[in-house]
């Protein structure tokens, strides 16, 4: 089993890097899932383990997959067939899925302030958000003079408004009620 993972890893890594670069991780996971299912089919598995010429094997596999594979996916299948590795497609999918999960463990956090924050301030915000979210964070810093002072932090649907503007708005709401 570990030998198959070792064989599958470079293909999965290449596919994942390509997918990230082209912002198509979900699309690639869907393609790999489909290909892994096709490779598990009894008749296809017999074909993969037989003595078929790699070019013919690749074209047959691509034909079976039909429009589920884009041009880049077809290229991956051709390379894997040429190297006799189509049988490890389920392991390629498994490795790809692990890299996707690791990538998605990072949360993008928007930090909006009235002026540029110092490195120490950014480090404290980053550490606090990592602890609060239990995930790694990537800070996207933006400057908005209307904040007046303080910061507004957004991570997904969570907003922490520590700005003077936010405090004034809350004070105005209290006074009007």
Swiss-Prot record:
Pfam families assigned: OSCP (PF00213)
Predominant place of localization: membrane
Record-linked InterPro entries: ATP_synth_OSCP/delta_N_sf, ATPase_OSCP/d_CS, ATPase_OSCP/dsu
Record-level Gene Ontology MF annotations: proton-transporting ATP synthase activity, rotational mechanism
Gene Ontology cellular component list: plasma membrane; proton-transporting ATP synthase complex
Gene3D superfamilies, sorted: N-terminal domain of the delta subunit of the F1F0-ATP synthase (1.10.520.20)
Entry keywords, A to Z: ATP synthesis, Cell inner membrane, Cell membrane, CF(1), Hydrogen ion transport, Ion transport, Membrane, Transport
SUPFAM superfamilies in UniProt: N-terminal domain of the delta subunit of the F1F0-ATP synthase
Subcellular compartments: Cell inner membrane
Membrane topology: Peripheral membrane protein
Transmembrane residue ranges: none
Domain of life: Bacteria
Coiled-coil segments: none
HAMAP family per the UniProt record, alphabetical: ATP_synth_delta_bact
Subunit structure: F-type ATPases have 2 components, F(1) - the catalytic core - and F(0) - the membrane proton channel. F(1) has five subunits: alpha(3), beta(3), gamma(1), delta(1), epsilon(1). F(0) has three main subunits: a(1), b(2) and c(10-14). The alpha and beta chains form an alternating ring which encloses part of the gamma chain. F(1) is attached to F(0) by a central stalk formed by the gamma and epsilon chains, while a peripheral stalk is formed by the delta and b chains.
Purpose: F(1)F(0) ATP synthase produces ATP from ADP in the presence of a proton or sodium gradient. F-type ATPases consist of two structural domains, F(1) containing the extramembraneous catalytic core and F(0) containing the membrane proton channel, linked together by a central stalk and a peripheral stalk. During catalysis, ATP synthesis in the catalytic domain of F(1) is coupled via a rotary mechanism of the central stalk subunits to proton translocation.
Family: Belongs to the ATPase delta chain family.
The name this protein goes by in its record: ATP synthase subunit delta
Taxonomy of the source species: Bacteria, Pseudomonadati, Pseudomonadota, Gammaproteobacteria, Enterobacterales
Gene name of the record: atpH
């Amino acid at each position: 089993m570990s030998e198959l993972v070792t064989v599958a890893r470079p293909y999965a890594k290449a596919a994942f890097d390509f997918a990230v670069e082209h912002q198509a991780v979900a699309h690639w996971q869907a393609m790999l899932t489909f290909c892994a299912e096709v490779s598990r089919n009894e008749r296809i598995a017999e074909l993969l383990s037989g003595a078929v010429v790699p070019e013919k094997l690749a074209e047959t596999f691509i034909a079976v997959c039909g429009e589920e594979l884009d041009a880049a996916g077809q290229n991956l299948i051709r390379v894997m067939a040429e190297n006799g590795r189509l049988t490890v497609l389920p392991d390629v999918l498994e490795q790809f899925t692990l890299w996707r999960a690791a990538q998605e463990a990072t949360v993008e956090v928007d930090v909006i302030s009235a002026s540029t924050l110092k490195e120490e301030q950014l480090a404290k915000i980053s550490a606090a958000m990592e602890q609060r979210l239990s995930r790694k964070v990537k800070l996207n810093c933006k400057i908005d003079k209307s904040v007046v002072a303080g910061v507004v932090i957004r991570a997904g649907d969570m907003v922490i408004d520590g700005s003077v503007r936010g405090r004034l708005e809350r004070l105005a709401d209290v006074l009007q009620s």
